[in-house]
Amino acid sequence: MQREALVAALEREGFAALVTVTREPGALDEHTHPFEAKALILSGEIHLRIGDDERCYRAGDVFHLPAHLPHAERYGPAGVHYPVGRK
């Protein structure tokens, strides 16, 4: 998926304007967000752990997190960069 396609899809799904996130290598312990999030990885990688399940998302992958879902984040050796829609 390209950035333009993501923007169009998010608008159709009622997400607010995109926010661009850049994270350095590292991690965030388990936490939640008060919003639903859908993002397209542009560079780097992010590992999302939900319960015992961990998935890795790399450039070109899209991840979707419901609001209030406990999860942990770990960023690859080059960090991660992605636009994300929130609602």
Residue ranges and their predicted role:
Residues 25-26, 43-46, 54:
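Short, charged/polar surface micro-motifs in flexible loops or helix N-caps
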Residues 67-87:
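Ligand-binding loop in jelly-roll beta-barrel domains
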Residues 16-33, 67-68:
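Conserved short histidine dyad/triad with adjacent acidic residue
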Residues 51-68:
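Short acidic-glycine-tyrosine-enriched beta hairpin
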Residues 8-13:
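N-terminal acidic leader/helix
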Residues 1-2:
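Fe(II)/2-oxoglutarate oxygenase catalytic core
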Residues 32-48:
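Short, conserved beta-strand element in jelly-roll/cupin
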